[in-house]
Amino acid sequence: MTYPFLLRWSSPLAAAALLLAPIAAAQAAAAPAGLTGNAEAGKAAFRKCASCHQVGPSARGGFGPKLTGVIGRKAGATTDYKYSAAMKNANIVWTEQNLAGFLKAPSDFIPGNNMRFWGIGNAQQVADLLAYLRTQ
């Protein structure tokens, strides 16, 4: 007797789905739920980011990649910055949820990336930064 609802480990697709489901759930849970970001507060908070990143029409990559239009962009996709292999191979799009998870703990979210930053523990500050980045 066969049970079509049972997944077989011999199916690579089924195995991948089971293994990746917890990662996807963790990334979705990383968003600062229920918080409304303030773009002006985010602009002020971005001053710390500006030591490595630029935004705006004349932004370019330097010590870190430019962040203009980062929301909705594939990770590791701009051509003016030399990304780590980990970032190039992350195969994610910078949704607000993914950015929130990355800003909270960059090295945990994408192990082996080049960002030398401990992360932001304040969920409101993350929401504010996302609100500001939405305007860029």
Located regions from the model:
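Bacterial N-terminal signal peptides that target proteins for export
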Residues: 2-16
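Short, cysteine/histidine-rich loop/knuckle motifs that typically chelate Zn2+
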Residues: 48-51
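Gly/Gly-Pro-rich "capping" loops immediately C-terminal to redox-active cysteine motifs
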Residues: 39-43, 57-96, 114-119
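Short, basic/glycine-rich phosphate-binding loops at helix/coil junctions
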Residues: 18, 80-82, 110
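C-terminal capping alpha-helices of c-type cytochrome domains
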Residues: 93-136
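Electrostatic cytochrome c docking/interface patches
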Residues: 26-46, 57
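C-terminal segment of classical bacterial N-terminal signal peptides
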Residues: 18-27
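Protein kinase-like catalytic domain
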Residues: 53-56, 134
